[in-house]
Design a protein with these regions (language model features):
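Short glycine-rich phosphate-binding loop at a beta-alpha junction
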Residues: 1-7, 97
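Generic enzyme active-site microenvironment
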Residues: 5, 68-69
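Short, well-ordered alpha-helical microsegments
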Residues: 10-14, 107-108
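Short Gly/Thr/Asp-enriched flexible loops that form oxyanion-binding sites at enzyme active sites
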Residues: 12-21, 83
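Short, glycine/charge-rich flexible loops or terminal/linker lids adjacent to PRPP-binding catalytic cores
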Residues: 22-67, 138-139
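Acidic, divalent-metal-coordinating active-site segment for phosphoryl/phosphodiester hydrolysis
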Residues: 70-80
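PRPP-dependent phosphoribosyltransferase catalytic core
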Residues: 81-142
Length: 142
């Protein structure tokens, strides 16, 4: 019933999906970017913390099904925060929310955490990397 997206790279995919399916498009944005009163959810990232917001006047019924689209799932914090904005403020059931990400970084555990929190998640591709090799290159560069 609704396509939602997380700022900003998710907009690229979600806008097209919403247009092609003729569905409303809801933006989850950084604080202060939306014109009306908002619901806010703070969360942790792999490198700090931040918040996202959704407008309070968004027309969402508790029975609506929502697809949340983003480009990447790493730790899962952003997607979970967005999903919780809908479950806590619009009384959307977790079973009515599907999180769709283009890329999954499974080594960081985000997709597993999303599933453990009770949300459905689908990804188009997984990108595995060897942390030991990554850190050896990183330390060599420094």
């Amino acid at each position: 019933d609704i396509v939602a997206s997380i700022e900003s790279r998710g907009f690229i995919f979600a806008g097209t999906i919403a247009r092609d399916l003729s569905l409303p498009f809801v933006l989850a944005r950084k604080p202060g970017k939306l014109p009306n009163k908002t619901y806010r959810k703070s969360f942790n990232l792999e490198y700090g913390s931040t918040s996202i917001e959704i407008q309070k006047n968004t027309k969402i019924d508790k029975d609506h099904k929502i697809i949340i689209v983003d480009d990447l799932v790493a730790t899962g914090g952003t997607a979970i925060a967005c999903a919780e904005l809908f479950t806590k403020n619009f009384n959307i059931s977790k079973s009515n929310i599907l999180i769709v990400c283009v890329i999954d970084l499974p080594d960081l555990g985000g997709s597993n955490l999303i599933a453990k929190r009770g949300y459905q998640i689908k990804t188009l591709m997984e990108f595995w990397f060897n942390l030991k090799i990554f850190y050896s290159i990183y330390n060599w560069v420094l």
